[in-house]
């Protein structure tokens, strides 16, 4: 029973739950970026290059024979994957940059000095009176 309670304590920690949410959102974001690159970015680029569909770009190493599919280097899909990565990396970079800026602003925000208590105020007045008495001839 000890292992189960340890696992439960581990699983409900804030960091683990936050990480799980981040992974799920990251996977969904990856799908959105893949669709954006494949369906929005690549078609105009292919059109500018001369009507090329990047997902079909490949070098056939061995032609298909019977039931055996062809062996190809699908470099067009690789180019799309590289663009996916660049967009995701840039989005993460910008997010981290914003978070770091917010953290710096929080750290720099001046805090008001604490109001001295009545006892501290009284002690300060006594100190000032003693200093004044010591200065008099």
From Swiss-Prot:
Membrane topology value: Multi-pass membrane protein
Highest taxon of the lineage: Bacteria
Gene Ontology CC: plasma membrane
Chief location: membrane
Key words, A-Z: Cell inner membrane, Cell membrane, Ion channel, Ion transport, Membrane, Transmembrane, Transmembrane helix, Transport
Positions of transmembrane segments: 9-29, 79-99
Subcellular location: Cell inner membrane
Entry function: Channel that opens in response to stretch forces in the membrane lipid bilayer. May participate in the regulation of osmotic pressure changes within the cell.
Subunit architecture: Homopentamer.
PANTHER family tied to this protein: LARGE-CONDUCTANCE MECHANOSENSITIVE CHANNEL (PTHR30266:SF2), MECHANOSENSITIVE CHANNEL MSCL (PTHR30266)
Family the UniProt entry places it in: Belongs to the MscL family.
Name the UniProt record assigns to this protein: Large-conductance mechanosensitive channel
Encoding gene, per UniProt annotation: mscL
């Amino acid at each position: 029973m000890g292992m189960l309670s340890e696992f439960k304590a581990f699983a409900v920690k804030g960091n683990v739950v936050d990480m799980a949410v981040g992974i799920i959102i990251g996977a969904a974001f990856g799908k959105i970026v893949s669709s954006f690159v494949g369906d929005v970015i690549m078609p105009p680029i292919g059109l500018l290059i001369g009507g090329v569909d990047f997902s079909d770009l490949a070098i056939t190493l061995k032609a298909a024979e019977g039931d055996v599919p062809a062996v190809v280097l699908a470099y067009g899909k690789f180019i799309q994957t590289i663009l996916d990565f660049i967009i995701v990396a840039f989005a993460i970079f910008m997010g981290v940059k914003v978070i770091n800026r917010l953290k710096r602003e929080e750290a720099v925000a001046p805090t008001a000095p604490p109001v001295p208590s009545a006892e501290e105020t009284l002690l300060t007045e006594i100190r000032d009176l003693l200093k004044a008495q010591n200065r008099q001839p």
